[in-house]
């Protein structure tokens, strides 16, 4: 008889829940709930389990916020809870709450070739460190290392490191944004809101007034070639994504590969392929050759957060991935 665990991927607006086959890691019965419709995460879980008429005793939920102890307070939602209390209330034997990019990183060993698109570099070196990052509402970052037959995720808040410009244009962008918001982190330019910041700074640098555009507007106009400023913003976004990815590669010698997750890049895949991304990734001066062969992959799996939550839980329960 198949034994299932509950897995989840929770963001600021939606909670996606599914079942994970503990033996194989296969994800099934995925369903998305609007977080605004429920008073708590526990309430959503109860609804899901009731709808699917399944009894589970183990669970792992990935959440888009730092996890530092028993008390979890989401940064982009009103939900807050004690892990121990929720585990007790649900009658679970085991409940893990992990950072969303911990989950994405743990999905990588489970991905197949059809879940990846490669952008330059050679083959990954087995057993070497891996980096994963992704732009969405914010900028998530994690690393993954293989130790004693176990995958160990190294989460952090790498999206909030300083934005490090490396061209005259990027320097001007930094000056304009610093005057507006103070500290300019990488997330301030590599995210949905970050794309808007790039567009606005480009227009303001030319002493013009920017339109009130959303990320979707900028992407659509750039792809339609109907707005020079939007096209410049999207091009610069791709270049800065490359620089940032190259920095991650240098930090930990990620010869196992650098992986891009998040919902933004797939929306303009062909544009991204033709952009200056890879050149910027390798633009490391004296260490250009060091990063030259490091492969970069775009993750195109539908639910890496769910897949990785399942992988994390299965490994915790003693399975080898």
Swiss-Prot record:
Alphabetically ordered keywords of this record: ATP-binding, Cytoplasm, Glycolysis, Kinase, Nucleotide-binding, Transferase
Subcellular location: Cytoplasm
Residues annotated as binding ATP: 8-13
First-level EC class: transferase
EC number: 2.7.1.2
Gene Ontology CC: cytosol
CDD domains assigned to the protein according to its UniProt record, in alphabetical order: ASKHA_NBD_GLK
One GO term (biological process): glycolytic process
Top-rank taxon: Bacteria
Entry's Gene Ontology molecular function annotations: ATP binding; D-glucose binding; glucokinase activity
One Pfam family recorded for the sequence: Glucokinase
InterPro entries with a match to the protein in the record: ATPase_NBD, Bacterial_glucokinase, Glucokinase
Catalytic activities: D-glucose + ATP = D-glucose 6-phosphate + ADP + H(+)
The keyword Transferase belongs to this UniProt entry's keyword annotation: yes
Role noted for this protein: Not highly important in E.coli as glucose is transported into the cell by the PTS system already as glucose 6-phosphate.
Family statement: Belongs to the bacterial glucokinase family.
PANTHER family assigned to the protein according to its UniProt record, in alphabetical order: GLUCOKINASE
Name of protein: Glucokinase
Primary gene name: glk
């Amino acid at each position: 008889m198949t034994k299932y665990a509950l897995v989840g991927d929770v963001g600021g607006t939606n909670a996606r829940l599914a079942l994970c086959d503990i033996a194989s890691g296969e994800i099934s019965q995925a369903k998305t709930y609007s977080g605004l419709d429920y008073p708590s995460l526990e309430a959503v879980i109860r609804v899901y389990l009731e709808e699917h008429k399944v009894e589970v005793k183990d669970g792992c939920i990935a959440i888009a916020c730092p996890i530092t102890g028993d008390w979890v307070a989401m940064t982009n939602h009103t939900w807050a809870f004690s892990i121990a209390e929720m585990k007790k209330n649900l009658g679970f034997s085991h409940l893990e709450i992990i950072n969303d990019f911990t989950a994405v990183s743990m999905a990588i060993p489970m991905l197949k070739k059809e879940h990846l698109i490669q952008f330059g570099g050679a083959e990954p070196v087995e057993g070497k460190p891996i980096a994963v990052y992704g732009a969405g509402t914010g900028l998530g970052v994690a690393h993954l290392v293989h130790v004693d037959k176990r995958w160990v995720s190294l989460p952090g808040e790498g999206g909030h490191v300083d934005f490090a410009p490396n061209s005259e244009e990027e320097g001007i962008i930094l000056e304009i944004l610093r005057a507006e918001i103070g500290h300019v982190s990488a997330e301030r330019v590599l995210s949905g809101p970050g794309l808007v910041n790039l567009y606005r700074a480009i227009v303001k640098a030319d002493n013009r007034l920017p339109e009130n555009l959303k990320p979707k507007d900028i992407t659509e106009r750039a792809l339609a070639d109907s707005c020079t400023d939007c096209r410049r913003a999207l091009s610069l976004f791709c270049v800065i994504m490359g620089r940032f990815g190259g920095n991650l590669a240098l930090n930990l010698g990620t010869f196992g590969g650098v992986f891009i997750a998040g919902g933004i890049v797939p929306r303009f895949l062909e544009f991204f392929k033709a952009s200056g991304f890879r050149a910027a990734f390798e633009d490391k001066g004296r260490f250009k050759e060091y990063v030259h062969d490091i492969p970069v992959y775009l993750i195109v799996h539908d639910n890496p957060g769910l897949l990785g939550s399942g992988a994390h839980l299965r490994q915790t329960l003693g399975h080898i991935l």
